[in-house]
Amino acid sequence: MAQKVKWLATDDPAIMFEDSPVGRMKKELWDASDEEIDKILLDYGIPSLSELGKAGSYIQTTPRSKQIEKRRKNDIVFVPIGCTENHGKHANSGLDTFMVTQILEGVRRYTAKIGDECSLAFPPLLYGGHPYHHIGMPGTVILPEEVVKETLIYTMLGLWDDGYRKIIFINNHGHCWMLEAAIHEFCKRYQLPGIFRTVEWHRSVREFFTPTDTNGNDFDTPFIHADEAETAVGMLLFNDMLDMSAAEEAWPTSYLFEGQFDTSIDCYRRPSSWSLGEGH
């Protein structure tokens, strides 16, 4: 008989965590004070300037002799996934790329501090895939789906050839179905041993992007593209790339009955994720 799943309640009846290592970690963060959160961020060196051009931070900025030694100790490589996309007049179009790289740079700094440094690869997609309703959006550059998939497949193949057996995409953009398809096609095509996965980091911490009166956040809406929550993360990581004087208050309009499609992080548990349909 399967073991019954246990849940960890919070001070908000709508928020609970699974009684698992991941759920217990999230519950600990949920209950942490602002001072404790600041200490955790300090452990990861967040905020810090972008390290895309810093020696020793990425595979591509590290002497090969040193990178080989690093990989022999830890063959996990994180691959940041971003894009070039309109995020409103107040934000930079490279927001997704800078957000995910600077988060992962914090992970690398922390793992180096504890003596088990992971590796980071340069973002393979500075321009990404997009849904149909993004066509014609100024500031957004759209690549064909097959280009996205094949770019990711051959990125994985090159990293595998270099000895990395645990390749993890960390996605900061909405083209998740393309990443999933790339991983499955890579495994079918080459049938190589390893662990290959993609993580939607926003969904991974969806509870913290859900408005609540009990946990001290001031969000009016759950996380969605270019909103107050995403902007707040940008202000933490790269404040000088944002111009809040140009920010505009705006609300989406639904053309279907309410309750059909969910938001970016599926926080409402609705029947369909946002990407499971198109039309006009």
Annotate each PLM feature.
Residues 1-166, 172-280:
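Extended, histidine- and acidic-residue-enriched regions that form the cofactor-binding/catalytic faces
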